[in-house]
Amino acid sequence: MGDTMQQRLTQDLTQFLASLPEDDRIKAINEIRMAIHQVSPFREEPVDCVLWVKNSQLMPNDYNPNNVAPPEKKLLQKSIEIDGFTQPIVVTHTDKNAMEIVDGFHRHEIGKGSSSLKLRLKGYLPVTCLEGTRNQRIAATIRHNRARGRHQITAMSEIVRELSQLGWDDNKIGKELGMDSDEVLRLKQINGLQELFADRQYSRAWTVK
């Protein structure tokens, strides 16, 4: 009985989707995926619900310290063009019609800029949503970048400065960004802002004799 109902639902759903114009079909698929996500055993995992959205809805964040060298970016483009998108772009909602990129800026740039990909993907890109406060989104971006071994020191120090000014202490910064206390202190010192480390003593390694 259950298998028969499932087969009938699957068949009806397939026929319904096939009858829709393409943009309406994509919208319907997204809505169905979100409905399934609500009852999924894996609904706590962002990748459980990958949606297709217009690339014009995505915008970069203003804090990403990641940088990809031209050869790596060229290889990334070749990989996406040949193998397809194997990783969605991680985003957060900023308003009803816009999403801010948490991770995947270069995938977005390539997907939006490559003529062959624009044609193949019909102006859409795959995204998965990660919600949270600005502090949490910054930390998520840094974790993604550091896990791949890529981040710019100066930009990273700016992130530490902002998180410190938003009320995060050294322990929380280190825990959320995967740094030890010395690394947090050094990144603060790069900015040359005394107030950021006024409550800390200098490490002996930084003492000039």
Curated annotation (Swiss-Prot):
Q: Which domain of life is it from?
A: Bacteria
Biological process (GO) annotations?
Answer: cellular response to oxygen levels
What the entry lists under Pfam families is as follows: ParBc (PF02195)
Q: What is this protein called?
A: Uncharacterized protein YbdM
Source organism: Escherichia coli (strain K12)
The gene it comes from is ybdM
